[in-house]
Amino acid sequence: MQRSISLTAKRLFVHWNLQGIGNPPTVPSFFNLCGSGCWERSFASASGDYREILRNRLSDIIKVDDAVDLFGDMVKSRPFPSIVEFNKLLSAVAKMNKFELVISLGEQMQTLGISHDLYTYSIFINCFCRRSQLSLALAVLAKMMKLGYEPDIVTLSSLLNGYCHSKRISDAVALVDQMVEMGYKPDTFTFTTLIHGLFLHNKASEAVALVDQMVQRGCQPDLVTYGTVVNGLCKRGDIDLALSLLKKMEKGKIEADVVIYNTIIDGLCKYKHMDDALNLFTEMDNKGIRPDVFTYSSLISCLCNYGRWSDASRLLSDMIERKINPNVVTFSALIDAFVKEGKLVEAEKLYDEMIKRSIDPDIFTYSSLINGFCMHDRLDEAKHMFELMISKDCFPNVVTYSTLIKGFCKAKRVEEGMELFREMSQRGLVGNTVTYTTLIHGFFQARDCDNAQMVFKQMVSVGVHPNILTYNILLDGLCKNGKLAKAMVVFEYLQRSTMEPDIYTYNIMIEGMCKAGKVEDGWELFCNLSLKGVSPNVIAYNTMISGFCRKGSKEEADSLLKKMKEDGPLPNSGTYNTLIRARLRDGDREASAELIKEMRSCGFAGDASTIGLVTNMLHDGRLDKSFLDMLS
């Protein structure tokens, strides 16, 4: 492409000014702008001929030190190697994502008098763009044009990528238009870069439309283009559009690969289209596209989330038969599923299989097993697993700690749970709502009301927001520990806040009031439930009936029973047993017998408290054996 360099430069400067950048920064030595963190080291002599490495073994350089040593050999050589050879090394380092090192090496080349060419500058522009330093990328472009280099399509595509990642998508679109105007022909890579940028900025319709525009401009989308679009659509949940694009792609000359199928299968799994994902898996297999570990892991993980652990196990066996090695994600998903299904033995067997295959468990694996041990009251083994993961340099997160703390609190070992909480804080981890709520509940269960309140106060002071479950546990604990006045203060604050109390909150307060002898207050709150948009459930009715019975207000209790039978919710075993005990204590044998018959006709039986009361009254002669027979 023959274009006037001065014309190109002029138009690019116009483009910058139009985008509100002004003239690009003037940079006497732009490499100095990479900051004090640039790579510095004295070059050691490396063994071997650098030419042979650059020619045949450049792909072997996977460590930064190897690259720096090779650069050291090159700059010691006389004459200096060609710029082409330096570019090979810089490109290899850029592929390691060590962009700062690329800039630093470029600076040292400049200091040594090794001139950069168009390709070198393009590498630098790409590095600055990848580091989201667009102004420095523009400065390099300005410098290279000042030196007489015409930017090529690769250079401008890198700049385009910089615009996309700097959240300047409108500038990116304008740059492509400017490129066309200047006589450049955007290639597949250019368009794919812009498509990716459009998806990054939630412009899915524009991204999809650009695929058709590519064809109209004589540029055919390739597998990477389609993969970018499919990935963007799946992340947005537009799975149907992704599937139609797959069909359109396969009707053309491009064959979908396992990566595209994996993307759609994973999208289907995430958006709960499990059966469609399995059908697509079968379809790809029938087309001769071999699934890989990612395919199986997505499906297994999704099946586990749906509780279909037997199907997940079948897929695991299938992949092993096909010599596709499961990875930590595959095993962890199954282990977690088995734990949640209560099949801890199977989970342990899978863990043993992981170790046998030299697959290192990750934090998710360990956390799942710790949860399993806690669920089965095997706390010592849970603690051992916790210590094992730390010894393997797999450090627990808040979820892991919270799981183990919950296990200790459940086992009424709340002090050990609190010790874990302190250890977690010392590691710099901040407990979340679940952590604090678990401890508050644990202390209330241990009848340690003071420490429960202390933990709640600490929770609020560090900025962790209580949820409605936290408040319900706090209110319930205060009420059951005879601190109704404090509970009322919290309840009134809750009603003024933006958080909506639920039916459980109201039930707790109604019960607290009734048990504290404030039945009228409880009744007032009960009657106001409908005004708050909350329908009383059977527990609310039973609580109120129990309160009336305790107060001796039999008529009000009977009235509520009648209302339940007429309007719902229907009475349950608790309703009848509460009323039967109240009538028995009042010596009303006839009413008690009628209630027992009604209860039995509804399919309910006497509970332990009722049978115990009848047995005691039978022993002291207040009842005859017929009552016990009726109950049983």
Swiss-Prot record:
Pfam families: PPR_1, PPR_2. InterPro entries: Pentatricopeptide_rpt (IPR002885), PPR/CCM1_RNA-binding (IPR051222), TPR-like_helical_dom_sf (IPR011990). Keywords: Repeat. Coiled coil: none annotated. PROSITE patterns: PPR. PPR repeats lie at residues 46-81, 82-116, 117-151, 152-186, 187-221, 222-256, 257-291, 292-326, 327-361, 362-396, 397-431, 432-466, 467-501, 502-536, 537-571, 572-606. This is Pentatricopeptide repeat-containing protein At1g62910. It comes from Arabidopsis thaliana (Mouse-ear cress). The lineage of its organism: Eukaryota, Viridiplantae, Streptophyta, Embryophyta, Tracheophyta.
